Amino acid sequence: MKYLLPSAAAGLLLLAAQPTMAANTGGYATTDGGDVSGAVKKTARSLQEIVDIIEAAKKDSSGKVVKGGAFPLVITYNGNEDALIKAAEANICGQWSKDPRGVEIKEFTKGITILGTNGSSANFGIWVVNSSNVVVRNMRFGYMPGGAKDGDAIRIDNSPNVWIDHNEIFAKNFECAGTPDNDTTFESAVDIKKASTNVTVSYNFIHGVKKVGLSGSSNTDTGRNLTYHHNIYSDVNSRLPLQRGGQVHAYNNLYDGIKSSGFNVRQKGIALIESNWFENALNPVTARNDDSNFGTWELRNNNITSPSDFAKYKITWGKPSTPHINADDWKSTGKFPAVSYSYSPVSAQCVKDKLANYAGVGKNQAVLTAANCK
């Protein structure tokens, strides 16, 4: 199914669903980003202007570099790169070899928020490195160049306490012959790696992406706490996420059109997969390509309750030649520990019926509650 997400003007129902405190991310992250007392607020029209604003915020009024940043920062991005996105769409197989374009938030801990205006768009990524207290909201990322050079839409490296909320990330789920492994047409939507932890990924609309996201860059990069909630994934291939160790809590997400595999829980990680909606999915929950250190999962209150539901929701399973475990009996294999935050999941049916009104850009950061499910 192709999802058409309404804009903020599409209905009054969005007005009654504003979030409370920004730090209530519904997940492990507990950050307001730069939206705190003493913040400096700037507007940027381009990638370069965002870069310049961030670099200036690393120095005090005397020009001295301040470790972690001189002040909290809120950047409103109102640029439009639809022309670049359209050109990339017309030349899909020409994108992977280009140089990646991106804003690097590096060694900034004072707090930073990048907020896109409605109608803005970006053909560049945001890469968070050795930073913390970062929020990215209402940004529309399309057809990132530089797939062969790690041109992710969002990359989080060595950075705790990050919130990725109400964005749209899209590409083309397509293999271009001649690229390495025929799979570097585009890189990831959201990669979280290298000791990053306490990250919340919420209310994003991610579609047409082949490799959605990593939790960990290698079998030694393990041990993080991540929450994915109220995201829509449509026409994607795999890595939802590819989890190397640690804890992943995924609730109230909609998965439609998984072409290869969904959750891939490796390196003795554990995932709580709760109150989600799955349909048209191949291997939605699995552990594979990991020798013997398979992870475990707890399945709770999803639309699928037993293998008897697979045909109804078009769930299928493949058996690779390498060692693997599929959730094809739809039974939990582990018990997830108590989470450190409060949250109120709605039913999986409500996710199916209502989430498109809330996920993605142009929604004024509206949230889905039980009151909106009626």
From Swiss-Prot:
The primary site where this protein sits is secreted
Extract the signal peptide range: 1-22
Q: Where does Ca(2+) bind?
A: D150, D152, E187, D191
- Cite the SUPFAM superfamilies for this sequence: Pectin lyase-like
Protein origin, superkingdom: Bacteria
* Cofactor detail note: Binds 1 Ca(2+) ion per subunit.
Q: Name one GO cellular component term.
A: extracellular region
Record keywords: tRNA processing included? no
The cross-references to Pfam families, in alphabetical order and at most eight, read: Pectate_lyase_4 (PF00544)
The GO molecular function terms of this record are: metal ion binding; pectate lyase activity
Q: Name one GO biological process term.
A: pectin catabolic process
Which cofactors are reported in the record for this sequence?
Answer: Ca(2+)
Enzyme Commission code(s) on record:
4.2.2.2
Give, as in the UniProt entry, the pathway in which the protein acts: Glycan metabolism; pectin degradation; 2-dehydro-3-deoxy-D-gluconate from pectin: step 2/5
Function, as annotated: Involved in maceration and soft-rotting of plant tissue.
Q: Which PANTHER family match?
A: PECTATE LYASE 18-RELATED, PECTATE LYASE 21-RELATED
Instruction: State the name under which the record lists this protein.
Output: Pectate lyase 1
Q: Which organism is it from?
A: Pectobacterium atrosepticum (strain SCRI 1043 / ATCC BAA-672)
Q: What is the lineage of its organism?
A: Bacteria, Pseudomonadati, Pseudomonadota, Gammaproteobacteria, Enterobacterales
Question: What gene does this protein come from?
Answer: pel1
